[in-house]
Amino acid sequence: MAIVSSVPLASKSCLHKSLISSIHKLKPFCRTIPTLGMSRPGKSVMPSMSMSSPVSDDGVQRRTGGYHSNLWNDDIIQFLSTPYGEPAYRERGERLIDEVKNMFNSISMEDVEFSPLNDLIQRLWIVDSVERLGIDRHFKNEIKSTLDYVYSYWTQKGIGCGIESVVPDLNSTALGLRTLRLHGYPVSAEVLKHFQNQNGQFACSPSETEGEMRSIVNLYRASLIAFPGEKVMEEAEIFSTKYLKEALQKIPVSSLSREIGDVLEQDWHTNLPRLEARNYIDVFGQDTKDTKLYMKTEKLLELAKLEFNIFQSLQKTELDSLLRWWKDSGFHHITFSRHLHVEYYTLASCIAFEPQHSRFRLGFAKACHVITILDDMYDVFGTIDELELFTAQIKRWDPSATDCLPKYMKRMYMILYDMVNEMSREAETAQGRDTLNYARQAWEDFIDSYMQEAKWIATGYLPTFDEYFENGKVSSGHRVAALQPILTMDIPFPHDILKEVDFPSKLNDLASAILRLRGDTRCYKADRARGEEASCISCYMKDNPGATEEDALSHINAVINDVIKGLNWELLNPNSSVPISSKKHVFDVSRALHYGYKYRDGYSVSNIETKSLVMRTLLESVPF
């Protein structure tokens, strides 16, 4: 339990000044922010964790993590038996795609549903709908044309419902701000000021009509895509959060109330697109009374359901391949660690569910699973002498280097060796160049940082915050979780682009920082009970004598909010020379890994929310 104290919060100037000063600038950061990434997927928050040191089969005293057993076995494949791989379903899907394209292309003033007084909001509605339903990949050209049209009418005061609307409209402007910003259009959040009164409150009536509530929903969604220094976005988030939470207490249970609940739950930086699509399918269009609009929502909904279920037939094939890799690699002999390959595959499927990204999904699942095993090996199971030997032999990158290693390390060495080499061959096919040495260096740096932390544990040394933070940038695992999987995609990453998304780019730094900071807030108590004293919390308290755990947590949570805005800027900066499409997958890796810490340490306690995610997005089909 955090210690409650009346000691004032330590000044932000006491800690990583460059981070704080940079975060509050709207423009791109001028200084490199010291970062820390993911508190390696899986540090436990289970208070019942065993910290004993049993004698292992080799007679060595070893610590244990006390993790629960693997939740999934080969029987999971049986749950993925689905008829939706049949050609008839795919053919129906193709027909629906054509019909939805016609919906985009038929938007004109000749359509009686559209007029110069509502055409802008109608166009935005269609784009927003296909994106939230997870079917937007089929309509890239149509979305681009639609948003170009909307942007051509964008003003400093926002937009109205239609091109001839006299007064700007909050719903249209908020939805337009969010959607245009996410697609790289240079739109300023200052437009929202025109909807505030003198007290900073956003214009709304006390009646709380459905239309007004939907306006505030879109205001809230827009506020999450804030850049550093945008005070109006902070005000919009505070106002809309309060408004929607109060509205939920008053309105009856309906698809609107469920949508509001889902939106409040779906934090932008832990939002998984496939999970969002699954949830939105349940509420989309249910309250539609207009006949023609109902027909449109029905087509969109049917396509979304088909797409969701058809993808599961591909997931069955991929998961079967992953389970064979796990078994053939001998992971079942590694009993000291967590086994989360199914969970990591689920996360990968939630951020990249386009069929062509199979290598990314499998590569991400494998890399993250190996990271987890290495984490437990360095933090808990290995002796300091064994770990130093393993670290040195990794640099040789030669199977003969395993001759001097303990049996369990021989297996891990060859698993890592084979995995990195395999993904390098896949990356060479995709990128047209050899990236093995690049990947090897990333893994060597990562393992060196683990070794540093193992030494801290062995000696009981508590580093300064900056010392801990610098090493943690590498030990986060974010870089090695993202690097090789994205290189296997059919997206070109020439050297000049790669250096803007990989280490030492700000995008990589900030993505790592948010995971380290959030991970430490979820895991520090269990880590400390296990003998791992160093964390963002303990190092902050060391640097700021008199600060309590509550002070440290409050400060770190504030920093996390600022880092999120910086990460938004790095992804969406309209003046960047790097396309959003090239940066998005690194950003999405951050979202996926961050999701594991949304409620607790979901990598060690994976039998609650993480298990639910597997069930809802991987194993359960959408009913028709």
UniProtKB/Swiss-Prot annotation:
UniProt feature, compositional bias: Low complexity: 44-56
Amino-acid positions noted as binding Mg(2+) 3 in the UniProt annotation, renumbered to this chain: D527
Presequence boundaries: 1-48
Molecular function, one GO term: terpene synthase activity
CDD domains linked to this entry: Terpene_cyclase_plant_C1 (cd00684)
Chain ranges for the short sequence motif DDXXD motif as given in the UniProt record: 375-379
Name of the protein this chain belongs to: (-)-beta-phellandrene synthase 4, chloroplastic
Organism expressing this protein natively: Picea sitchensis (Sitka spruce)
